[in-house]
């Protein structure tokens, strides 16, 4: 589900004042200012105010917050379980009981203006496929995007992320390469490890040389993309 104008739901704890809007003069005195009661987009307090507002409401509905992830909420009723994850104004949720999911959607729509987007198929670069066999995650679309970003969409595929017996060291004497690009490539692959556990070791190995990457390190890094 997607919360519309989410930040406008936040209640401000601080005193914040704004100039009177153009065309609106209170009491014919242009020197008066308005005190905000609700957050506005562009206000530095807005994201936090929205999070506190949503967090308070979810606790009122019987949810408890995950200990490892502050954006994860869990609600248990007898043998029924409802789990939801919040990412700013996007909320994904699921339950082992369909009626519990439906009830949650209804109470949320009464409290906030939002739209239901149907069965989850894509979220933060993750493609989600659900069927009777289970729930399957992939990042094919994301992988194509990063291959294009680094000009490697036509690279010849290889069978393994690293050459057998690959030895890399910080004292490599090959030419230095563009550090920001190298770091960016490492970051892109780190996000990919969410579904590609087979490249984690290789990414960790080339990630050791981000402070001073050399051509040899870059070639090893590019191999992982292939």
Protein language model features and the residues they cover:
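Long, low-complexity, charge-biased intrinsically disordered regions
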Residues: 1-226
